[in-house]
A protein has these predicted regions:
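Flexible glycine-/small-residue-rich
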Residues: 18-20, 39, 82-84
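Arg/Lys-rich, often Gly-containing low-complexity segments of ribosomal proteins
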Residues: 21, 42-49, 71-75
Length: 88
């Protein structure tokens, strides 16, 4: 699967669409230039955002601290920056 991204000053930026409260957790694929992700956590008090960061950290092999939601923290559509990566 080719994940669309763009380069930023410190790493890369991804557009992500999350589906919280799913029966399973994982990367579901790509739709256009957006990564589709299913999460089991509810969208309450940042639980889904935390699980998204954890999942991306595991899948991409980067530290959780290098991943930041820069837009859409209260939305299903998010923009995520991953510092220290140049490509996927």
């Amino acid at each position: 699967m080719r994940i669309p991204f763009r380069k930023s000053k410190d790493g890369i930026v991804l557009a992500v669409r999350v589906q919280p409260r799913s029966s399973k957790r994982g990367i579901e694929g790509v739709s256009g230039d957006t990564l589709k992700v299913k999460l089991t956590a509810p969208p309450h008090e940042g639980a889904a955002n935390e699980q998204l960061i954890e999942l991306l950290s595991e899948e991409l092999g980067v530290r959780k601290g290098s991943i930041k939601i820069i837009k859409g923290s209260g939305s299903r559509n998010k923009v995520v920056e991953i510092k220290g990566l140049e490509t996927l």
